[in-house]
C-alpha cells in the first residue's frame, strides 16, 4: 500500500483530464478554438515513421472490413478521434502522478509546482499548434485559450492532491484519496463532461446547407462541360438500366468518401482565404474565391479512389466537380524557363506536386464546386485539385499555395514510402445480384456494380458464373 498515492494521483489526473477535454471540446464547437487532443494526435502522425503509419492504416482498414464496423472512412476517423482523446486522458494520469511526486518532495512550493505544471502543459500544447499552423482564431486567442485551460487544470489538480493529503494527515500522504473523495471527483468530472457535450451538441447541430445534396440516379449528357464530356443522350438512353441495389452513379456530397491526414478537417474562412501562386513564374499572383468562381469554369464527372481501398472496398466515389483548368492559371502567371513541376501546399500541412506536362492537361481542374454547390469543408473548401489518372493521395484539398519549381517536387505520402505515381489499378466490384428480381422478358438475373481504371477507361466487363 506504500505506492497507493501513485494510483490515486493517476486517477485524479485522469478524471480531471476528462473535464479538461470536455471544456476544450466545448470551446471547439462554440468558438472554433483549437482542440488539443486532436491536434496532438495529428502532430504525432506527422512525425512518426511512414512505415509505422502505413502499417496502422492497413491494419485499421482490415479490421473495419473484417468486423463489418461500418463505412471505412467515417469509422476510421472515429477510431482516430477515440485514440486521440484516450491518449490525452492517459497523459492526464501521468500528469497527476508527476504533480503528486513533486508535491511530496516539496509541499511548501505548492504554488510554484502548480504554476510550472500548467506552464509545461501550455508550452507543449502551444508547440503542437505552432507545428501544425494556427487555426482560424489567430495566435493571441489560441495562446490565451491554451494557457487558461492548462493553468486551470494544474491548479485544480494540485488542490485535489493536497486536499486528499490533508484528509490523511496522519499518514502525511499527498495524493491518496478515499472512496468518498473519489466519487466526488468522478461525479464532478462526469458532470462537466456531460454538460459540455450537451452545450457543444447545440452548437454543432446540423443546419440545412446547399452542400447536402442527394445522389443523382443517372448521369445525363449535360453533366459535363469539359474535355471529359458525357456520351450523347441517345447513347445514354440505350444503356441497360442499373440492377436493383446498384450504387448510384453519382455519390452525394454527404456520402463521398473522406480520407485525409486530419482528425478534423480545416475550417477555412472563405472571406479571408487566398491562394498564392509564385516561384518560377513571370507574374506572381494571389487568388481569392471570387477570382476563381467568377471566371469560366468547366464541369467533369470524376471518379476518385483511395490508394488504401481494398478489393471490394467502399473508398470509391463519383461526383460532378466544377473548376478552372490549371493550364489557364499557368497561362496567367507565366512559367519561367527551368520550371519543371508545380508544388502544392494545403492548409493542413499536406503537400504534393505534379509535373508541368501533367499540369498542362486540360482535364486538370482547380475545383471550387462539387455537385453544383461550393466544396463542402470536409472535401477541401474552398479549393482542391483534380488530377486524372491518380489516386486521391496525389490530390491535395484546402490548397493555399502553389509554386513553380525547378525540381520534381515533394509529396507527403511519397516521402513516407508510398507510390511515386499512384496510378490506379483496374477495379471491378459487384454491388448486387438481384436474384429475386429477374428480367421479366428474358428471365435473366440482373447484376450490378462498378468498374474503373482511371484514365485507361473500361471497354467491357465480363462476368463468370459457376454452373
Q: Which stretches of residues belong to each language-model region?
A:
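N-terminal signal-anchor transmembrane alpha helix
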Residues: 8-33
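N-terminal secretory signal peptides and thylakoid transit peptides that target proteins
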Residues: 171-190
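N-terminal secretory signal peptides
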Residues: 96-177
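Structured, non-membrane catalytic/scaffold regions adjacent to prosthetic-group chemistry
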Residues: 34, 77-82, 89-96, 133-138, ...
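Extracytosolic (periplasmic/ER-lumenal) interhelical loops and adjacent juxtamembrane/interface segments
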Residues: 36-72
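Individual transmembrane alpha-helix segments
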Residues: 59-91
